C-alpha cells in the first residue's frame, strides 16, 4: 500500500503543480514576465495553496490523482469566474467578493446573464463532475489520509510565511486588482488580500453627533458594483 501511494504521489504532485500553473494562466490579466509568467512570490504562494487544497482533498478522498484533478478544477473555475467578472465589471475577483456568495444563490439570473451558454455548461459540468468523482473514487485507506494531513500542515506553514513576506513588501497599500493579479496571480492575490484583512485593525467607531433630518426627507442611495 505504501509503495502504491508513493508511486501515485510521484505522478500526482508534478501534475498538480502543472495544472495549478495552467489554471492560473487562464486568469486575466496575464503576468508581466516572460510568456505571461507571474512573480516568484506569486508562483510560490500558488503552489503552496495548491498543495494545501491537495492535502485537504487527499484527506477526504484518499485518492491522490482525484485530489490533484479536484484542485485543478477548482482553480480553473475561479479563473473563469474572475474573467467573467472582469469582462462585466472591469476588475478581477477580489477577496471581498466572497461575501456575495449567498447573493449568487438568491439571484442567480443576474450572474448567469453575464455568462455565455458554453461557460455555464463548462462551470456546471466541471463542478458537478468533481463532486461525482470525489464520491465514486474515494477510498477508506488510512495512509493517503495521513499524508494529506502532513501536506496540509506543511503547506499552511509555508503559506503563512509567504503571505507575511508579501504583506511586508507593501502589497495592496493602494488597491489595484489589475496590477496585483498580473503580478501575483489570482489565487495568490486573493490569499494576500485575505491575509492583510486578517491583520488589519478595525477603525474606531464614529463619535460625531447625529444630524437631524427633516420630516419626510427622501434619501436616495445608489450602489454600484
Specify the residue positions occupied by each region the protein language model found.
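Soluble catalytic regions of membrane-associated enzymes that act on cell-envelope
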Residues: 168-224
Amino acid at each position: 500500500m505504501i509503495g502504491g501511494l508513493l508511486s501515485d504521489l510521484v505522478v500526482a504532485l508534478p501534475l498538480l503543480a502543472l495544472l495549478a500553473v495552467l489554471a492560473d494562466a487562464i486568469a486575466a490579466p496575464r503576468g508581466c514576465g516572460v510568456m505571461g509568467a507571474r512573480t516568484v512570490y506569486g508562483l510560490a504562494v500558488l503552489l503552496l495553496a495548491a498543495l494545501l487544497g491537495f492535502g485537504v482533498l487527499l484527506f477526504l478522498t484518499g485518492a491522490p490523482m482525484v485530489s490533484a484533478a479536484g484542485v485543478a478544477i477548482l482553480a480553473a473555475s475561479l479563473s473563469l469566474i474572475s474573467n467573467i467578472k472582469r469582462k462585466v465589471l472591469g476588475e478581477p475577483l477580489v477577496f471581498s467578493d466572497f461575501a456575495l456568495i449567498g447573493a449568487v444563490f438568491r439571484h442567480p439570473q443576474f450572474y448567469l446573464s453575464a455568462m455565455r451558454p458554453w461557460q455555464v455548461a463548462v462551470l456546471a459540468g466541471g463542478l458537478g463532475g468533481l463532486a461525482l468523482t470525489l464520491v465514486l473514487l474515494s477510498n477508506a485507506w488510512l495512509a493517503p489520509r495521513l499524508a494529506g494531513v502532513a501536506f496540509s500542515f506543511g503547506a499552511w506553514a509555508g503559506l503563512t510565511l509567504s503571505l507575511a513576506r508579501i504583506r511586508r513588501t507593501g502589497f495592496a497599500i493602494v488597491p489595484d486588482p489589475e496590477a496585483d493579479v498580473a503580478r501575483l496571480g489570482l489565487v495568490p492575490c486573493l490569499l494576500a488580500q485575505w491575509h492583510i484583512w486578517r491583520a488589519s485593525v478595525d477603525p474606531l467607531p464614529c463619535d460625531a453627533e447625529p444630524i437631524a433630518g427633516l420630516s419626510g426627507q427622501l434619501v436616495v442611495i445608489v450602489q454600484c458594483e
